[in-house]
Every structure is written in C-alpha cells, then in structure tokens.
Amino acid sequence: MIKFPEDKPRVPKKEPRYFFIYGKPMSGKTFFASYFPHALDINTDDNAEQSRVPFVSLLKDENNEPVSDIRGRLFEIIKGLPQTSFKTVIIDTIEDVVDAITKQITDEAGEKYISDGKLSYGKGSGMVKKVINDLVLDLKALPVNVIWISREEEQTDIASGVTKNIPALKQKYYNIIAGNCDLVIRTQKT
C-alpha cells in the first residue's frame, strides 16, 4: 500500500534564482527586477538613470566613452562581483548584449556580417553562441540571483493569422538562457 505524504506545503530545497523577464517597452521589466535584493543592473539601453538600482553601463565606460571590448567588460564585471555586496545581477537587455558581442566579433574579423568571409559556415554564429554560453555558466557559478531582461515583439502566423507575443531575443539564444532559468515572466501594462 502506498504511503501518502501529509497534505501541507513543503519547504523547497532551493529558491528560484534565475529569471527571464520579457515585455513591451515601459511595461515594468526593470521596475519589477529592481525589487530583488541588492541588485546591480548591467545596462545597455540608457534607461538606467530612471531606475532606483545601481548600474554599470555595458556599452559605455566610466568616462561615457564607447566600450570596444564588450566580452572583456562583461567578464571583468562578473569577476569583480564576488568582492561586492550585490546579490542580484540584472542583464538589461540581453538582445543588446548579443548584438554588441556580434558586432565585436565581426569588427575583430574585419567582416561586415557574422556569416561573411572568415566567419562563414557557422563559425561566427558559433563564436557568439559560445560567449553567451560562457556568460550563462559564469553567472550561474556565482551565489547571486540572475535576471535576464528582453523586449517583446509580436509574431504572426501567416496561415492562421494568429499573433502571439514572444521575447525579442533570437530563439537560439532564448533556448540557452531560458533553459537555464527557473522562471520566465512576461510583463504587461493593464
């Protein structure tokens, strides 16, 4: 005979720590993320001044000059996090991070597009994917909450005419990031 557990809530062994939040602009993504404990916003879209969360600009340095080594800056931030009191890292927005990494890789290769010349046959895309994988794994190794923020876009199925809201992050990168998250959240204004 099977022995049933008691009918009472259990205390989970692990709280969710990895979140993917997406929504339309100004739908409260960063605002919601700002309520996580001791948050640091790694920002790409210049709206950090509107938030109550301390931030580091990924695309501009402390002198407001453009950063050319995005990968180096990302991993410099990650390397320095254990020496701080931050308990939450917000990546705002992940599609801008992917675009900046793609630009850096194409610039370094002297190519215009990620599939041109030295980067053809999937080499360039593979390089971007590796940087994203490394970023996910490096952040998961830290004892912090990680919040990935993405914008939202509409996708319409031409055959059925049905429109659905999806993250603006390309599917192949969404699968890597959301596959390592405990929860995917969509924000919307009511």
Task: Name what the model sees in each region.
Residues 2-100:
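Conserved P-loop
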Residues 34, 102-103, 159-161:
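Short amphipathic alpha-helical segments
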Residues 62-64, 113-130, 168:
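A short acidic, glycine-rich active-site loop
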Residues 73, 97-100, 135-138, 176, ...:
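Alpha-helical scaffold elements adjacent to nucleotide-binding pockets in ATP/GTP-utilizing enzyme cores
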Residues 85-88, 142-148:
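Loop/turn-to-beta-strand initiation segments
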Residues 91-121:
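Conserved P-loop NTPase nucleotide-binding/switch module
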Residues 131-143:
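Catalytic-core regions built around general acid/base machinery
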Residues 146-190:
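Phosphate-binding/switch region of NTP-binding enzymes
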